[in-house]
Structures are given as structure tokens and as C-alpha cells.
Curated annotation (Swiss-Prot):
This is S-adenosylmethionine synthase. Mg(2+) binds at residue 18. Keywords: ATP-binding, Cytoplasm, Magnesium, Metal-binding, Nucleotide-binding, One-carbon metabolism, Potassium, Transferase. GO terms for cellular component: cytoplasm. It holds the Pfam family S-AdoMet_synt_C. It comes from Limosilactobacillus reuteri (strain DSM 20016) (Lactobacillus reuteri). ATP binds at residues 16, 174-176, 241-242, 250, 256-257, 273, 277. Belongs to the AdoMet synthase family. It is found in: Cytoplasm. InterPro entries: ADOMET_SYNTHASE_CS, S-AdoMet_synt_C, S-AdoMet_synt_central, S-AdoMet_synt_N, S-AdoMet_synthetase, S-AdoMet_synthetase_sfam.
Length: 395
């Protein structure tokens, strides 16, 4: 864009109903992978007042106690009181798990390439579904993520920390944040224009107290002072009351916060959610690989921001297409970058799994506060270990 403009991203807390569902699905996935790294998992979760429904398809040699995983996850989030309308010890947990369809399994177990006689073992696994996936990176923050989303996630992490540490005693687990940043003509962040933050709370506390505490202890503690000015607008619990929340206020479902999970609306999204899926599902693994590519391209100095698209056919190992968009900021042509990516990154499902070591139980930690740009946990797709290889290829 050639003029100043506003852009907004949002995040939600770990106690948001959709995020409860994501965390339960990924907690089950992790437990299965701990016991059987080759588990095929597609677990969905739905939560509502007093009820958790876990359903989907699993093929595994492992046994896991789903009831216990569900209750432990809810307890860790902070739903431990019947007054919340949903709590770890008293909610009902219903499971309805089937095996993976043999029609899907035959294409994943033996890809089209293998059936046609290819000998490369990394050709063996076919994509678990057709689909298109995107990865993105920008140099506007040290995390290589949009500032709007980085700040939104940090606000949610901070409010959860204050709640769990008992610093603000009236906080309940459900919360949302939204940050609007003003950018200059060159897409550089200038200032924070608007902060929206809604948090669930106990009934006794006054709105004035909430506004004071959230502004001082959350917003001003998280957002650097140079981004805030006397024109910055604050909307803190703008409905005036947020006592009923969590699954009692809204039903939650796995996979409904895909923009919070990714790039806050700054990049395209192929539509496939991540949580509850093992790495043979390219919705997840190829999105991670695309982020890995984009971040290494930007870190290597070949673009100020980059978006990667990859697409797959079910049962076929090789991607059907790779696209790179550097938004006019590239120091190499997009054709050159794609050629380098094909040399440096193996985008077959088995290649991605090996490259990023994705058979490990590392997923529950991604199910709240974003899958990308994380500095609090070590995620392989955030590593910058391909920068030198890209420089070697591209010169």
C-alpha cells in the first residue's frame, strides 16, 4: 500500500471455548504419539455447558484414557469451579472415536508414486487429503510475525498469567483481545491505534476496577510505550459485563480459530485447521513447512515479507504446486526462490515429517497463543537453520 493504513488482528485466551476444544484435541494427539509415534489421528472436540464431546478417527496401537486427558486439560486451563458453568471434575465427557477410513489409509500408506514403482522411501506416504496451505513471514517484528498478532497474543498470555498467579483475583478463564496498528507507506508499524480487550470476571467486581487493572497491568505492561499515545483508543469489556463465559456462554469447537492460530489475517489461509491432526495431514504439516520456508527466506534477506502456497492431491507425495509471493520486496525473482526451495526443502509428507521431526508429542503447546512466532517454546518450524543453505544455493 502506498499510504498510511490501519490493520487489525485478534487473539483469544486458553479459556476461550474454541481454544479449550483445540487444546483437548491436541492433548489427546500428544498422548497417542507418546505411546505410538505412528498414530493416525483426526480428533475433534466440542464443548458446551457441562459437556465435552470428543469424536473423530484414530488408528493406533496405543491406549489412552481420554476422560482423564480431557479433565486434566480443562483443569490446567483453570475451569475448576462449578460457578463457571463448566468445570473439570463435573462436566460429562462423551467419546465417539472410529478408525481411519481404509480408503484414506491406502493412499496415505502407499502413495501414488510408490504404487507406480518409485523406490525413494520418502515417497511412500501420500498426502492425507487434497488441499492448499500457506506460510508467511514478515520482518516487522523479531518473531517474523505481524505486530498486530504478536501484541494480541501477548495480551492474552499476560492476562492468563495474572489470573493463574492470583494477582488479579476476580479474573475468569475466558478472554479476547484485538489490536489495531497504524502502518506507514512502507508497511512499517507507527503506533497502536486501538486496543480491545474483553475478559470474563467474577460478578462482584466493578467495571471501573476492571478497566483500571487491565489498562495498567495488562495493556501498558505488554505494549511498548512508544506505540501508545493520547490518541490510542481503549475498549475494555465494552459490553459492561462478562460474567457468563467459556463453554457456558458459547459452545466451542476444534478448528474455529484458524486465523488466531496463524497470521492474524495478514496472509491467506487454505481453510484447514491444525489441532487434533497428526502430521500425515498436510493441513497441519505442510502449513508448518510453509512457515519454515517463509521465515528462512525473510531471515536470509531475500524478502521483507513472503508468503508461500503449497497444494496437494490426496494419496500423492509430491505437492502439485508451490507459489511464492514477496509482495515486491524480493531481492531474487520468485522463480529463483521456488527453485531454491525445491532444493533445500523436502515437501513430500514423509519429507516434512523427517525434516521437522513431527512424530513427537509437541502439539498441545501450540493449541493456544498461536502456532507461529512463538518464543516461549521450541518449535522446529521456527528454526532458522536453512538460512545458510538458501544463501549457498542463491549466492
Amino acid at each position: 500500500m502506498a499510504e498510511r493504513h490501519l490493520f487489525t488482528s485478534e487473539s483469544v485466551s486458553e479459556g476461550h471455548p474454541d481454544k479449550i476444544a483445540d487444546q483437548i484435541s491436541d492433548a489427546i494427539l500428544d498422548e497417542l504419539l507418546k505411546k505410538d509415534p505412528d498414530s493416525r489421528v483426526a480428533v475433534e472436540t466440542s464443548v458446551t455447558t457441562g459437556l465435552v464431546l470428543v469424536f473423530g478417527e484414530v488408528s493406533t496401537k496405543a491406549y489412552v484414557n481420554i476422560q482423564q486427558i480431557v479433565r486434566d486439560t480443562i483443569r490446567k486451563i483453570g475451569y475448576t469451579d462449578g460457578k463457571y458453568g463448566f468445570d473439570a471434575d463435573n462436566c460429562a465427557v462423551i467419546t465417539a472415536i472410529d478408525e481411519q477410513s481404509p480408503d484414506i489409509a491406502q493412499g496415505v500408506d502407499d502413495s501414488l508414486e510408490t504404487r507406480e514403482g518409485e523406490a525413494d522411501p520418502l515417497d511412500k506416504i501420500g498426502a492425507g487429503d487434497q488441499g492448499l496451505m500457506f506460510g508467511y513471514a514478515t520482518d516487522e517484528t523479531p518473531e517474523y510475525m505481524p505486530l498486530t498478532l504478536v501484541l494480541s497474543h501477548k495480551l492474552m498470555r499476560k492476562i492468563a498469567q495474572l489470573r493463574k498467579d492470583g494477582v488479579i483475583s476476580y479474573l475468569r478463564p475466558d478472554a479476547k483481545a484485538e489490536v489495531t496498528v497504524e502502518y506507514d507507506e512502507n508497511d512499517k508499524p507507527l503506533r497502536v491505534d486501538t486496543v480491545v480487550l474483553s475478559t470474563q470476571h467474577d460478578p462482584e467486581v466493578s467495571l471501573d476496577q476492571i478497566k483500571k487493572d487491565i489498562k495498567e497491568q495488562v495493556i501498558e505492561a505488554v505494549i511498548p510505550a512508544e506505540y501508545l499515545d493520547d490518541q490510542t483508543k481503549y475498549f475494555i469489556n465494552p459490553t459492561g459485563r462478562f460474567v457468563i463465559g467459556g463453554p457456558q456462554g458459547d459452545a466451542g469447537l476444534t478448528g474455529r480459530k484458524i486465523i488466531v492460530d496463524t497470521y492474524g489475517g495478514a496472509a491467506h489461509h487454505g481453510g484447514g485447521a491444525f489441532s487434533g491432526k497428526d502430521a500425515t495431514k498436510v493441513d497441519r504439516s505442510a502449513s508448518y513447512a510453509a512457515r519454515y520456508i517463509a521465515k528462512n527466506i525473510v531471515a536470509a534477506g531475500y524478502a521483507k515479507k513472503a508468503e508461500i502456497q503449497v497444494a496437494y492431491a490426496i494419496g500423492v507425495a509430491e505437492p502439485v504446486s508451490i507459489m511464492i509471493n514477496t509482495y515486491g520486496t524480493g531481492t531474487r525473482s520468485e522463480e529463483e526462490l521456488i527453485a531454491a526451495v525445491r532444493k533445500a526443502f523436502d515437501l513430500r509428507p514423509a519429507g516434512i515429517i523427517e525434516m521437522l521431526d513431527l512424530k513427537r508429542p509437541i502439539y498441545k503447546q501450540t493449541a493456544a497463543y498461536g502456532h507461529f512466532g512463538r518464543t516461549d517454546v521450541d518449535l522446529p518450524w521456527e528454526h532458522l537453520d536453512k538460512v545458510d543453505e538458501l544463501k549457498e544455493i542463491l549466492g
